Amino acid sequence: MGTEVSVSDLLSAIQSGKLNFCMTSATQSNSGCSAYIGFLYALLGNPDVITSENLQTPGLAEQITQLLSGVDRSSGSSDWLKDLFLTGGYDAMVNYECLIISANQELEARGEETLYVVYPYDGLSLADSPLGYVDNGDTEKEQAFLDLQEYLLSDEVQNEIQRTGRRTGYEGVSEENRDVFRTDWGIQPDRVLSP
């Protein structure tokens, strides 16, 4: 707690039998895929882009296999994984920050030990879901899109989104929502998140 953790640190903990975790399938869920890509970036030394040649790096397949050998439960959905974690007595979970917050809220309400969030400094992957519009010349649909966009970007709605444990930008959280992003759970509300 309180120290920077690398993906290599996680790998060492798995190899020594100190760490097992739940993670969604990289082929079925964005959170699992994002974690897998983050792990690859870290194991490759954080190249600008992962190339086919990078994936042929000697030892990479063995390292990623060892890393994923720490998965003791998988799921096809991030929410399902959270639910499994809450009912299964597992030790750790790789998931979205907002779902760790949600799990901790439930664990705390039940009087159980909460999770401590770890952000691997060299293997962090972000889920950024932009809203887009394809212009097909329909001004009525375009206006509906612009109205929705304005609504979603309003201060009130951005605050409501943040109250669910979801960051609405890369530069921390608002003062009024700090109680959701609890530092005693390892959450770093002031951390500028970047992959």
Each model region followed by its residue ranges:
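Structural recognition of the beta-strand scaffold that forms the well-ordered cores
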Residues: 20-23, 91-96, 132
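A conserved helix-loop-strand patch within extracytoplasmic ligand-binding domains
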Residues: 1-42
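Extracellular/periplasmic juxtamembrane helices and adjacent flexible linkers that interface
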Residues: 134-195
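Ligand-binding pocket segment of bilobal, Venus flytrap-like solute-binding proteins
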Residues: 41, 46-119
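Second-shell loop/turn segments in exported
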Residues: 20-26, 68-71, 134-138
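Short helix-loop capping/hinge motifs at secondary-structure junctions, enriched
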Residues: 1-5, 41-50, 137-145
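Sec-exported extracytoplasmic/periplasmic mature domains
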Residues: 15, 39-48, 86, 105, ...
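Solvent-exposed loop/turn segments at secondary-structure junctions
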Residues: 26-31, 98-101, 122-125, 137-138
